[in-house]
Curated annotation (Swiss-Prot):
A molecular function GO annotation: S-nitrosoglutathione reductase (NADH) activity
Alphabetical GO biological process terms: formaldehyde catabolic process
UniProt: Zn(2+) 1 binding residues: C49, H71, E72, C178
Amino-acid positions noted as binding Zn(2+) 2 in the UniProt annotation, renumbered to this chain: C101, C104, C107, C115
Entry keyword annotation includes Flavoprotein: no
CDD domains from the UniProt entry: alcohol_DH_class_III
Binding site for NAD(+): H50, G203, G204, G205, I206, V207, G208, D227, I298, G299, V300
Reaction it catalyzes: a primary alcohol + NAD(+) = an aldehyde + NADH + H(+); a secondary alcohol + NAD(+) = a ketone + NADH + H(+); S-(hydroxymethyl)glutathione + NADP(+) = S-formylglutathione + NADPH + H(+); S-(hydroxymethyl)glutathione + NAD(+) = S-formylglutathione + NADH + H(+)
Cross-referenced InterPro entries: ADH-like_C, ADH-like_N, ADH_3, ADH_Zn_CS, GroES-like_sf, NAD(P)-bd_dom_sf
Main function: Oxidizes long-chain alcohols and, in the presence of glutathione, is able to oxidize formaldehyde. Also acts as a S-nitroso-glutathione reductase by catalyzing the NADH-dependent reduction of S-nitrosoglutathione, thereby regulating protein S-nitrosylation.
Gene (UniProt): FDH1
Keyword Magnesium: no
Organism per entry: Candida maltosa
Protein name: S-(hydroxymethyl)glutathione dehydrogenase
GO cellular component terms given for this protein: cytosol
Length: 381
C-alpha cells in the first residue's frame, strides 16, 4: 500500500502454530517481499475453518510445523512481484487455496477446477521456488494451503489470488474463500441441481447450509437437511430447507436411508455429504434414487478412512462423486459469486456467529467446536 514498504520486508503480527495440538502463538513475523509471479497482501479478515483445526490437531498427514495456518482471507494487494499481471497494487482480493493457472493439463481440460501447477510445493508449505516468505525468531515458518491468512500480511502465488468488487466488505468476502463457496458451488456447479429436484444435505454447518442456498436458488422441490443437532433445523429453514430430519430420533428400525427414500418417493436426485464421516457418506449414496441419483462428497474424511458400499448400489445407476471448492474456478468464477452476494442473491453475513480479534484467535477455535458456531471471523487489523 505504501511505497515505503514495497520491495522491503514487513514485520507484522501473525498467529503461529509452532507445533501440533498446541494453541496458536501471536508473534512478530517478518514477511519478505514478493518474488516473480508472487503477490503480497495486507489481510483484514479471515475465517476460521475446520480444515485449520484438522491440521493443527496433528492428524493431517500433510501437516508440517511451524506454520501460519488460515485459508479463508481477504485484503488489499500491498505489492506485486515481477511478471504479475492479474492483480495490481490496491486491488481488493481473496486468497485462493485452489489456484487457477489456465495453462496446466487440469486447467486446459475444462473438466475440473483443480490446478496442478503448484500442487507439489503448496503441499509442502513453501512457495513455488521451494522457500518460505515468513520468518520468526530466526526460524523459517511454513505457508499453509498457499494462503496463510492468520497473518496481517501474506505472500501468495499470482495464480492463487483474485481481484473482487471493492464494495464487498472484507469480513464477508473472506468467507467466500472457502466454506460458503464450497457448498454453493457443489449445488450449482458440481451437481448442477435443477428445478424440481429432491435433495438431501447431510451436515448443517457453513458448507451444508450453503449447499441449501444453492439448491434453493435452483428451485429444488424438496431440500431436506439431515443433522444430529436439532438447533440446525432453524438454520436450515433460514437458508431454504423444506424439511429437517434428526437421524438419532427416528423410530426404532427406521434408518435415515429408509426415511429419505420414503420422503422422496424412491430416493433423492442429489445428496450431499458435508460431514467428512464415511458412514454418513454411505448413507448419502444409498438414499439416492435408483437409476439416476447422484451423491456428492464434500466433507473431508480423516486420514486413512475409506468409503464402502455394495457395488449393486452403483450398478443400478447411482453415482458417487466429489467436489473441492465446490467445483468453482477461483480466478474466473469467484468474482461472479462475490457479485451474487452484493446483489443480494447469496447470504453471507448471516453465517458470522462469532467475531474475535487476532489476539483471541484461540478463542475462535474454541467457539468453532461449540455447537452454536457457524463461522467465526477474526479481525486482523
Amino acid at each position: 500500500m505504501s511505497e515505503s514498504t514495497v520491495g522491503k520486508p514487513i514485520t507484522c503480527k501473525a498467529a503461529v502454530a509452532w507445533e501440533a495440538a498446541k494453541p496458536l502463538s501471536i508473534e512478530d513475523v517478518t514477511v519478505a517481499p514478493p518474488k516473480r509471479h508472487e503477490v503480497r497482501i495486507k489481510l483484514y479478515d479471515t475465517g476460521v475453518c475446520h480444515t485449520d483445526a484438522y491440521t493443527l490437531s496433528g492428524v493431517d498427514p500433510e501437516g508440517a510445523f511451524p506454520v501460519i495456518l488460515g485459508h479463508e482471507g481477504a485484503g488489499i494487494v500491498e505489492s506485486i512481484g515481477e511478471g504479475v499481471t492479474n492483480v495490481k497494487v490496491g486491488d481488493h482480493v481473496i486468497a485462493l487455496y485452489t489456484p487457477e493457472c489456465g495453462e496446466c493439463k487440469f486447467c486446459k481440460s475444462g473438466k475440473t477446477n483443480l490446478c496442478g501447477k503448484i500442487r507439489a510445493t503448496q503441499g509442502k508449505g513453501v512457495m513455488p521456488d521451494g522457500t518460505s516468505r515468513f520468518t520468526c525468531k530466526g526460524k523459517e515458518i511454513l505457508h499453509f494451503m498457499g494462503c496463510s491468512t492468520f497473518s496481517q500480511y501474506t505472500v501468495v502465488a499470482d495464480i492463487s489470488v483474485v481481484a473482487i468488487n471493492p464494495k464487498a466488505e472484507f469480513d464477508k468476502a473472506c468467507l467466500l474463500g472457502c466454506g460458503i463457496t464450497t457448498g454453493y458451488g457443489a449445488a450449482t456447479i458440481t451437481a448442477n441441481v435443477q428445478k424440481g429436484d429432491n435433495v438431501a444435505v447431510f451436515g448443517g454447518g457453513i458448507v451444508g447450509l450453503s449447499v441449501i442456498q444453492g439448491c434453493a436458488e435452483r428451485g429444488a422441490a424438496q431440500i431436506i437437511l439431515v443433522d444430529i443437532s436439532d438447533k440446525k433445523e432453524e438454520w436450515g429453514q433460514k437458508l431454504g430447507a423444506t424439511a429437517f430430519v434428526n437421524p438419532t430420533k427416528l423410530p426404532e428400525g427406521t434408518t435415515i436411508v429408509d426415511k429419505l427414500i420414503e420422503m422422496t418417493d424412491g430416493g433423492c436426485d442429489f445428496t450431499f455429504d458435508c460431514t467428512g464421516n464415511v458412514g454418513v457418506m454411505r448413507n448419502a449414496l444409498e438414499a439416492c434414487h435408483k437409476g439416476w441419483g447422484t451423491s456428492v462428497i464434500i466433507g473431508v474424511a480423516a486420514a486413512g478412512k475409506e468409503i464402502s458400499t455394495r457395488p449393486f448400489q452403483l450398478v443400478t445407476g447411482r453415482t458417487w462423486k466429489g467436489a473441492a471448492f465446490g467445483g468453482v474456478k477461483g480466478r474466473s468464477q469467484l468474482p461472479g459469486i462475490v457479485n451474487n452476494y452484493l446483489d443480494g442473491k447469496l447470504k453471507v453475513e448471516e453465517f458470522i456467529t462469532h467475531r474475535e480479534p487476532l489476539a483471541a484467535i484461540n478463542k475462535a477455535f474454541e467457539e468453532m467446536h461449540a455447537g452454536d458456531c457457524i463461522r467465526a471471523v477474526v479481525d486482523l487489523s
